[in-house]
Curated annotation (Swiss-Prot):
Catalytic class of the enzyme: oxidoreductase
Binding site for NADPH: 14-15, 35, 108, 140, 255, 279, 281
NCBIfam families for the chain: PRK00094.1-2 (NF000940), PRK00094.1-4 (NF000942), PRK00094.2-4 (NF000946)
Biological pathway: Membrane lipid metabolism; glycerophospholipid metabolism
GO annotation, cellular component aspect: cytosol
Gene name tied to this protein: gpsA
Main localization category: cytoplasm
Annotated protein name in UniProt: Glycerol-3-phosphate dehydrogenase [NAD(P)+]
Keyword Transcription: no
Binding-site residues, sn-glycerol 3-phosphate: 108, 136, 191, 244, 254-256
Annotated active site: 191
Segment forming the signal sequence: none
Catalytic activity: sn-glycerol 3-phosphate + NAD(+) = dihydroxyacetone phosphate + NADH + H(+); sn-glycerol 3-phosphate + NADP(+) = dihydroxyacetone phosphate + NADPH + H(+)
């Protein structure tokens, strides 16, 4: 009997670790690659990722490794959970090894220099690979603690979607499929910006009306932008859009929410990110999204307002006053009503 090939998870962060555990619990051998040999040794010895998922036991079938070449050679299904700033530099030298492999991005970010999503970078590096993304309301710790969770795997490759569903679907983790890879991935990247705003609002003691307004206007804003890029607006009414937006803007477990909360408490951006100790993709996404929205002429007042606070020296009160005095627009303007006649 031929032994099953291991599944690779690239990245030693919280979500990569949670996904590695899920795969192992479903009976798969998993190789989790990380750069830091000390982190790999700590997981190997203590069966715990103390920096990113303290208190969560790592399944015995998860093997922490630091040899990327061997990991890629041995696996045909790879989940990529690398920070957006590192993905290209880590994988580009090994482009030939990625030919024909199934590469599924778990990273919700945008590359600063190119405004490319992670799956687009994977396609640049390995045009012969089969590409997908996994996104949705998936807080890493809750996934690791087996809270009931649903996610979306998106790809034009139906067989890839089925393979990922079979690998991850379990008693507490439900995997839906979508063909709108771009929309699913864009939703996951954009919502990080609005989670920072939501965290600030909570820290400042703003009411439930305000939080509801922020979330719904954020949905309108991010969908408006996505539609301008060719995404399907209906994608944003599902798990990868409104689902991910709600959980990220409502939970103190969200990294971007934590950054916003710290900012609302009076910390500087540098202090807030240092306190977090992990990558908060929303900060980087905000910078490139503000520029791109201006280039395209897409109306994104919440993005402009947060950028003004973090990078242009404006106070929160100044931005709030400007936003509330702005001319009201149509409530839902990103779906044509002709489609519902």
């Amino acid at each position: 009997m031929t032994q099953q090939r291991p599944i690779a998870v690239l990245g030693g962060g919280s979500f990569g670790t949670a996904v590695a555990n899920l795969l192992a619990e479903n009976g798969h051998r998993v190789r989790q690659w990380m750069r830091d040999p000390e982190q790999a040794e700590a997981i190997r010895v203590n069966r715990e990722n103390p920096r990113y998922l303290k208190g969560i036991k790592i399944h015995p079938a998860v093997e922490p490794v630091t040899d990327l070449l061997a990991t890629l050679n041995d696996s045909d299904l790879c989940f990529v959970a690398l920070p957006s700033s590192a993905l290209r530099s880590v994988l580009a030298p090994h482009a030939e090894l990625l030919r024909g492999k199934l590469l599924v991005s778990l990273t919700k970010g945008i590359e600063a220099q190119t405004f490319k999503l992670m799956s687009e970078i994977l396609q640049d590096i390995a045009p012969q690979a089969r590409i997908g993304v996994l996104s949705g309301p998936n807080l890493a710790r809750e996934v690791a603690e087996h809270a009931l969770t649903a996610t979306v795997v998106a790809s034009e490759d139906e067989e890839l979607c089925q393979r990922v569903q079979a690998a991850l679907h379990g008693r507490t983790f439900r995997v839906y499929a979508s063909a709108d890879r771009f929309g699913v991935e864009l939703g996951g990247a954009l919502k990080n910006v609005y989670a920072i705003i939501a965290g600030m609002a909570v820290a400042l003691g703003m009411g439930e009306n305000t939080k509801s307004m922020l979330i719904t206007r954020a949905l309108a804003e991010m969908t408006r932008f996505a539609v301008s890029q060719g995404a399907n607006p209906m994608t944003f009414l599902g798990l990868a859009g409104v689902g991910d937006l709600i959980v990220t803007c409502s939970s103190p477990k969200s990294r971007n929410y934590q950054v916003g909360f710290a900012l609302g408490q009076g910390l500087s951006l540098e202090e807030a990110v240092t306190r977090l100790g992990e990558v908060a993709e929303g900060v980087n996404t905000l910078k490139v999204l503000k520029v791109k929205a201006q280039e395209l002429g897409v109306y994104m007042p919440l993005v402009a307002g947060l950028h003004a606070i973090l990078f242009e020296g404006r106070t929160l009160n100044q931005v709030i006053e400007l936003l509330m005095r702005g001319e009201p627009k149509t409530d839902v303007d990103f779906i044509s009503t002709s489609g519902f006649n």
